[in-house]
Amino acid sequence: MSKSEGQTITKSARAFSPTTQKRREKALLEKRTRIMDAALSLFSKNGVSGTTVEQVSELANVSKSNLLYYFKSKEGLYLSVITHLLDVWLTPLQSFSAEQDPIETLSDYIKVKLEMSRDNPAESKLFCMEVVQGAPLLIKELETPLKTLLDAKSAVIIEWIEAGKLKPVDPIHLIFSIWAITQHYADFSVQIKAVTAKDVSDPAFFESTLSNIQHII
């Protein structure tokens, strides 16, 4: 029987089983991660201006159109990579609280930061490159969330000092010093290896470096 004039046929959306949906979500996440990893590798070597969307898509083994489905532009991809990096870096600092032992807390933080320099040197170099260039794409993140966090954790350090648990020191300069020293082992790894013939990937050198930084700080 033919359908009457004007009758419409509604096509229902395809429904996936929970297992299939979970598998699809995992595949999408893996592809997004692969794109971000490829972008990190290229951005940390060539910068934003020296990297093309085509290069990232080729390294990630996805089509350009597929990449632009996840990230609307090269700048958007870059910002996603570097803000994710900033989130990872700041997570250990967020755990600081006045109830903790300051020496133990700072020693653990130094270790985590040095491990990040050892395990993720490309991330450190990318962040360094961005800041040296004036942080044109990251300045809002530095002026708001980062500043808010540093103000809060500076207050914790001041509480430690006032309780007599830590020698008087400017909290901001203390945090900056930890960042500068630990990230040096990623950003200047070539110089360190040229002078010492080692880097922090060497377990013994890592432990020696960690011990000395903790003592200095």
Regions found by a protein language model. Name each.
Residues 1-19, 112-115, 119, 147, ...:
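C-terminal peripheral helix-coil segments that are non-catalytic and often amphipathic
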